[in-house]
Amino acid sequence: MAEGVFSGAIGIDLGTTYSCVATYESSVEIIANEQGNRVTPSFVAFTPEERLIGDAAKNQAALNPRNTVFDAKRLIGRRFDDESVQSDMKTWPFKVIDANGSPMIEVEYLGETKSFSPQEISAMVLTKMKEIAEAKIGKKVEKAVITVPAYFNDAQRQATKDAGAIAGLNVLRIINEPTAAAIAYGLGAGKSEKERHVLIFDLGGGTFDVSLLNIAGGVYTVKSTSGNTHLGGQDFDTNLLEHFKAEFKKKTGLDISGDARALRRLRTAAERAKRTLSSVTQTTVEVDSLFEGEDFETSITRARFEDINAALFKSTLEPVEQVLKDAQISKSQIDEVVLVGGSTRIPKVQKLLSDFFEGKQLEKSINPDEAVAYGAAVQAAILTGSNLSDDTKDLLLLDVAPLSLGVAMQGDVFACVIPRNTTVPTIKRRTFTTVHDGQTTVTFPVYQGERVNCKDNTLLGEFDLKGIPPLPAGEPVLEAIFEVDANGILKVTAVEKSTGKTANITISNAIGRLSSEDIEKMVSQAEEFKAADEAFAKRHEARQRLESYVSSIEQTVSDPVLSAKMKKGAKSKVEAALADAFSALQIEESSAEDYRKAEIGLKRVVTKAMATR
């Protein structure tokens, strides 16, 4: 890579199943990886020798299911006891353990048992995306805009930002995926001067968002947003996998539930069948020797696939209804419905949505896999002020808080301070008081959600305001100030009005949050892993070079014509040097340097032996 640092920033769509990276240099470019693919699997695999990320990791998943990690986005910012984490764990071949309430992924790597946080796994994927960009740009990349589902809560946003820091990136902004896709649409096929209401329907591999925007010139105003951070293509695959599993059991009497390799192979076949059924109405599925020597062969129709996933497909319309209701807009006022995310290729999903909008033609002009990274790259260029075109220099994004924020009052009742769909950044205040006479400390538990009872919402963290004057209950005036930044991340301050005493919290001490020390430690670990990866690659290369050289010299020695050209008595020296090179290849612990020395040693002897007499 050329020296120097890229002055701009890259846009990264960190997806549940696939990720995508783009850069903006006078126009947007989606960058392909070394396999030539414009999307890279969000997979990380650990082996006794090395760590693999992306295509290489996904390609060996069936051979190494226990140590191939994916779906980190379904763990990030969640607690171990989260209902969705517990249900996902039943389908994942890798092990997830409880570390003080946070989920950690346990794998075997370099012959040891290691555990990684979801942030570290995501950081490995981000590092891969950063390297893909660096290979194209030819400079070191330090800054990025990373996208998250619009419906991600505070904990999930902060954890994604932390993953960026572990990957050595300065995360300039966390932006919402549907908003990024709206930029791609507004600058591309949807370019128009007139004001319009655009609904972005973003159904990806693991998450689902619906956002309603008003686009007027270069101003993108999000009116409302809704979604499900646990719905996507993976769930459709899982339902199909369960169907195939039951069919295999019926035919053979065998249950593959406990066999991680068979499950991975069948899941891959299910994913392939799902994709095929978007363009044909029937397909066959064949997996040779799936389990205990038994082959699996079946055919599946599009209608059956739709039936298996009917409830999930239908559930995608609920957030659509919600955003219209929240924005107080009727469906007839929506000018365009834009499809984003690979799962919107499913014909049934398109039909349900089109029918909901009275047969409206859906907007399929943008690439559903690349639109989010495209929008992120535009935002990255705006934030770094690099090479903006006329279209982008006046672009303004006004996004919203996806979920209400507030504190718990007596009786665990949720007191909302910032209602959902409030434009961010924002500052809101609300006054509270004491409930007991002489009370000098008040605890502020901060929650995010829409329910009246706090236990049904997400606890983001809590803090104490101490030193309140001991007055009768109800007299002290305590003001809670909620501040949400452009990343959708919250800071809360409480002030006692008569003394001016303050206490604050940037929600970062809740369960699963990483302290700056944790992040620093993970950054240095990430660098160590990267160094180990590089050392492994160098060793592998050096070994291959030595092997091919040894093999060519062996041929020379055994060829009577060629060996006759050697100096007298030199053949035995060459044979001895060959034996030394062989022993270097036999030693497991040989380093790249050992192989290099063995190759140089052998070359010297051969050169002397072949020197003209």
Swiss-Prot record:
Annotated spans, Nucleotide binding domain (NBD): 1-391
GO cellular component, one term: cytoplasm
A GO biological process held by the record: chaperone cofactor-dependent protein refolding
Sites where the protein binds ATP: 16-18, 73, 205-207, 271-278, 342
Chain span(s) of sequence motif Nuclear export signal: 574-582
Swiss-Prot/TrEMBL keywords: ATP-binding, Chaperone, Cytoplasm, Hydrolase, Nucleotide-binding, Protein biosynthesis
Residue span of region Inter-domain linker: 392-402
Region (Substrate binding domain (SBD)): 403-613
InterPro entries cross-referenced by the UniProt entry: ATPase_NBD (IPR043129), Heat_shock_70_CS (IPR018181), HSP70_C_sf (IPR029048), HSP70_peptide-bd_sf (IPR029047), Hsp_70_fam (IPR013126)
Enzyme Commission code(s) on record: 3.6.4.10
Region ranges (Lid domain (SBDalpha)): 516-612
Entry's localization field: Cytoplasm
CDD domains: ASKHA_NBD_HSP70_Ssb
Protein family membership: Belongs to the heat shock protein 70 family. Ssb-type Hsp70 subfamily.
Quaternary structure, from the entry: Binds to ribosomes. Binds close to the ribosomal tunnel exit via contacts with both ribosomal proteins and rRNA. Directly interacts with nascent polypeptides. This interaction is dependent on the ribosome-associated complex (RAC). Interacts with SSE1. Interacts with FES1.
Function: Ribosome-bound, Hsp70-type chaperone that assists in the cotranslational folding of newly synthesized proteins in the cytosol. Stimulates folding by interacting with nascent chains, binding to short, largely hydrophobic sequences exposed by unfolded proteins, thereby stabilizing longer, more slowly translated, and aggregation-prone nascent polypeptides and domains that cannot fold stably until fully synthesized. The Hsp70-protein substrate interaction depends on ATP-binding and on allosteric regulation between the NBD and the SBD.
Protein name per the record: Ribosome-associated molecular chaperone SSB1
Provenance organism: Eremothecium gossypii (strain ATCC 10895 / CBS 109.51 / FGSC 9923 / NRRL Y-1056) (Yeast)
